[in-house]
Amino acid sequence: MAAKEVKFGREARERLLRGVDILANAVKVTLGPKGRNVVIDKSFGAPRITKDGVSVAKEIELEDKFENMGAQMLREVASKTNDIAGDGTTTATVLGQAIVQEGVKAVAAGMNPMDLKRGIDAAVDEVVANLFKKAKKIQTSAEIAQVGTISANGAAEIGKMIADAMEKVGNEGVITVEEAKTAETELEVVEGMQFDRGYLSPYFVTNAEKMVADLDDPYILIHEKKLSNLQSLLPVLEAVVQSGKPLLIIAEDVEGEALATLVVNKLRGGLKIAAVKAPGFGDRRKAMLEDIAILTSGQVISEDVGIKLENVTLDMLGRAKKVNISKENTTIIDGAGQKSEINARVNQIKVQIEETTSDYDREKLQERLAKLAGGVAVIRVGGATEVEVKEKKDRVDDALNATRAAVEEGIVAGGGTALLRAANALTVKGSNPDQEAGINIVRRALQAPARQIATNAGEEAAIIVGKVLENNADTFGYNTATGEFGDLIALGIVDPVKVVRSALQNAASIASLLITTEAMVAEVPKKDTPVPPMPGGGMGGMGGMDF
């Protein structure tokens, strides 16, 4: 086991604080509409330019082990806030730094760290309650656009695009962000349920120009197993032919004789038909087939539930207004499922999302939820250079997360104003002077985001904060982008409650841990032993070759 170095008390806290300051000072320059960029060196390719706090925080690694511990713990504040709310990472970092700085001073002055922590926790709880009380629910698409614009650092076109996407796919719909191949940023919406399986044979195509199969008002057979011969399928095929409607077969696979027979029937014109593989794998495939069945008011034909292919009747098949099948994707539009059954399934998936601990499972469940509840929108981010596209994509991701958070828990006045007001409204009392000091630490720290936004804009922070606090209206604040004071909600300068409260809760949680640190242990860095010099004298037996 390698030797360890141990630091105690004041020295330990000072080293931690130094690490916190290095990371926070790099991150906080990005805060606000006039925040600056940070350039991050990459070991290959062009450097990355970003205004996203968590991206900067993740890149910082310090040489000194003890300072690095402080930096990594503050990085955790940004990461946690990003995981919960998807935005507000810079605000969280600024709050964390402010609480740690004040807390370390208080401990150095002889106050009890545990009482300070209790005071900090009590103050944070009251501020969060205050934020919920002041929250304004989001109703209109214009309000969603405002939130997106603020989070994208004032880019109105990004805010509007996100609002359009949310309007089209609903609040539950999936909105993904991709890099475009062109200079334009565009929005593409896929309505209905789409899964990534295309037709099994190009002979199923109905539109040879576009190479797609369009089925209008089809029956949909959802089968869990492989189909290799059609003997057992004949009764249902005959019933479909008599009805004059097209048929879509979704099965694990359609092979050999079965596929050949379907293609021959299609080419002879007797049967409008297409077959696709079932989406997903294993248990996820079963769940997705069940989703399709509920969406189309059909049944999954499976021997698990005692239904054999030969006994299938038309009423067991799903229905939809239209099915569009390309080489790679199948889209079911306007399924005939009952609204109540779809809603019950949506609620069931929501419960699974809450309970799952795996990020991958959560992502897949959210995709299923979106396909059932609304649809899928893709925002393709364009730009003149790769560096610009990556920077813009960071901002779109932030804006998207912020708008989702705003829809969930409402909005408050932006620009750090809500926290300023909450600091003024703090009434909680500590049970001893040290707890009071903890409450005052939070009271002062709550001014930090507003001050930093003003500083980044080249303003005098103390004057701006003073003017804002002179007016008692909750939503009165400073619009840094235009340099005017006014009602921030009316001006569209808003922050989602979820982002603001997550930033504060995570900052206080990690900062409290740093303040209550009394000892630190780190490995002693290994000293590199120099490589011994080559023995002189040239090669043996070849005297006289010394150089």
Swiss-Prot record:
MF GO annotations: ATP binding; ATP-dependent protein folding chaperone; isomerase activity; unfolded protein binding
PROSITE patterns (UniProt xref): CHAPERONINS_CPN60 (PS00296)
One GO cellular component term: cytoplasm
Catalytic activity annotation: ATP + H2O + a folded polypeptide = ADP + phosphate + an unfolded polypeptide
Principal location class: cytoplasm
Residues holding ATP: 30-33, 51, 87-91, 415, 495
Compositional bias per record (Gly residues), positions renumbered to this chain: 536-547
Keywords for the protein's UniProt record, in alphabetical order: ATP-binding, Chaperone, Cytoplasm, Isomerase, Nucleotide-binding, Stress response
EC number(s) on file: 5.6.1.7
Compartments where found: Cytoplasm
One GO process term, biological-process aspect: protein refolding
UniProt similarity note: Belongs to the chaperonin (HSP60) family.
Subunit structure: Forms a cylinder of 14 subunits composed of two heptameric rings stacked back-to-back. Interacts with the co-chaperonin GroES.
Function: Together with its co-chaperonin GroES, plays an essential role in assisting protein folding. The GroEL-GroES system forms a nano-cage that allows encapsulation of the non-native substrate proteins and provides a physical environment optimized to promote and accelerate protein folding.
Name recorded for this polypeptide: Chaperonin GroEL
Gene source species: Bartonella henselae (strain ATCC 49882 / DSM 28221 / CCUG 30454 / Houston 1)
